């Protein structure tokens, strides 16, 4: 298994600490006035979603996790688990709603997503960074709405709620950034 030294660490890298796979979500190289440089990182567990802070000094090493990404089709949610299918082998995998986490609010039936496997066990889901979803409910526009705050809440077809500009109407399809949970633009449909 490959290992990473302090200089290899960067945001987005996947590492393993004490047998648990993590993703680096924040990276900071610190060079104090006195003493050796070190790296401070925030890591998010793929298993339980907890965020931890770790410090690495020169010479410290961490392992690369045994992770595999597989593109699969999201089929449905049975109330406890989300069901996914490998479109080439037709093998189905169930992942608990807790393990799917925040990704669930951006997933539509039939959507292709990346399912993450650790040592052969499905542990999480990564949706595309940008998805197109239909607005099913939002407040109507009134004359003078452009004064002050120029955003209104909108419920999307997955149940997620995002803030959208007043000129966007119910029934329109919009592009949403799934990382920040924000409206990007109207979709070209």
Swiss-Prot record:
Keywords, in A-Z order: Cytoplasm, Elongation factor, Protein biosynthesis
Gene3D superfamilies in the record: 2.30.30.30, Nucleic acid-binding proteins
GO cellular component annotations of the record: cytoplasm
Predominant localisation class: cytoplasm
Any one GO BP annotation for this protein: peptide biosynthetic process
Protein's UniProt keywords contain NADP: no
Protein's pathway: Protein biosynthesis; polypeptide chain elongation
GO function term, MF aspect, one: translation elongation factor activity
Signal peptide positions (record): none
Compartment(s) of residence: Cytoplasm
Annotated SUPFAM superfamilies: Nucleic acid-binding proteins, Translation proteins SH3-like domain
Domain of life: Bacteria
Family membership noted in the UniProt record: Belongs to the elongation factor P family.
HAMAP family documented for this protein: EF_P
Function: Involved in peptide bond synthesis. Stimulates efficient translation and peptide-bond synthesis on native or reconstituted 70S ribosomes in vitro. Probably functions indirectly by altering the affinity of the ribosome for aminoacyl-tRNA, thus increasing their reactivity as acceptors for peptidyl transferase.
Name of this protein: Elongation factor P
Recorded name of the encoding gene: efp
């Amino acid at each position: 298994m490959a290992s990473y030294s302090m200089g290899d660490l960067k945001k987005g890298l996947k590492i393993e600490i004490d047998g648990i796979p993590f993703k680096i979500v924040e990276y900071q190289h610190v060079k104090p006035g006195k003493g050796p440089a070190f790296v401070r990182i925030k890591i998010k567990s793929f298993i339980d979603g907890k965020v931890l802070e770790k410090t690495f000094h020169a010479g410290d090493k961490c392992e690369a996790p045994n992770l595999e990404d597989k593109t699969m089709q999201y089929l449905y949610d049975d109330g406890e688990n989300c069901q996914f299918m490998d479109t080439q082998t037709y093998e189905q995998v169930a992942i608990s709603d807790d393990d799917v986490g925040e990704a669930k609010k951006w997933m539509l039936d039939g959507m292709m997503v990346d399912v993450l496997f650790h040592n052969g066990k499905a542990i999480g889901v990564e949706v595309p960074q940008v998805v197109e979803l239909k607005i099913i409910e939002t407040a109507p526009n009134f004359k003078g709405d452009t004064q002050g705050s120029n955003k209104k809440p909108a419920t999307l077809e997955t149940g997620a709620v995002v803030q959208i500009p007043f000129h966007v109407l119910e029934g329109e399809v919009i592009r949403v950034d799934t990382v920040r949970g924000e409206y990007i633009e109207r979709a070209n449909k």
